[in-house]
Amino acid sequence: MTAATTSQPAFSPDQVSVIFVLGGPGAGKGTQCEKLVKDYSFVHLSAGDLLRAEQGRAGSQYGELIKNCIKEGQIVPQEITLALLRNAISDNVKANKHKFLIDGFPRKMDQAISFERDIVESKFILFFDCPEDIMLERLLERGKTSGRSDDNIESIKKRFNTFKETSMPVIEYFETKSKVVRVRCDRSVEDVYKDVQDAIRDSL
């Protein structure tokens, strides 16, 4: 990218629709995203999945760094996550897909600002609001079968703290711009999805 184009986002909001999907670990983001992909033809990009894939990619210069961050419940440097997201959006746009759910991102203020400045402005944040005790129960249950290294009680508590300290300020910032839809997630998947569908219909 040349110096002359650094202030221009890579995509126009008329060309690409991005909805950020945030919520604490175990809030049910993945389940709801799967339903939206099926019913509304969204492309679901999970920042965590992109990072895990990069971590396992042979010859990745970032693999070890990503592995350590995930293990410690820390946030991966934003340059890596932004590059992976940008490449994934670009590949899908080339395939004529223009609607994206970005799950688990932005997790910090600087990520939010950099994404909207360099890639594309988001439509809104879909925030899955769930009590910690329910999220903990779901994650420990998932950990029995998921094989994920971070589905253990120590990693989960670190992830809860990271979410509260770094992601809640992002949600509060977007609330000042009237760009947050809060959905209560201490209910059945079907009840949550009804509210999610209402939000999608109102926005697109």
UniProtKB/Swiss-Prot annotation:
Region (LID): 141-151
Highest taxon of the lineage: Eukaryota
Cofactor note: Binds 1 Mg(2+) ion per monomer.
Any one of the GO BP annotations: nucleobase-containing compound metabolic process
Family matches, as Gene3D superfamilies: P-loop containing nucleotide triphosphate hydrolases (3.40.50.300)
Protein residues bound to ATP: 26-31, 142, 187
Database matches in SUPFAM superfamilies: P-loop containing nucleoside triphosphate hydrolases (SSF52540)
Binding site for a ribonucleoside 5'-phosphate: 52, 74-76, 104-107, 111, 148, 159
Subcellular compartments: Cytoplasm; Nucleus
Transmembrane stretches, start-end: none
pH dependence remark: Optimum pH is 6-9.5.
Similarity comment: family membership: Belongs to the adenylate kinase family. UMP-CMP kinase subfamily.
NCBIfam families (alphabetical): UMP_CMP_kin_fam (TIGR01359)
Note: Present with 1500 molecules/cell in log phase SD medium.
Family annotation (PANTHER family): NUCLEOTIDE KINASE
Protein name: Uridylate kinase
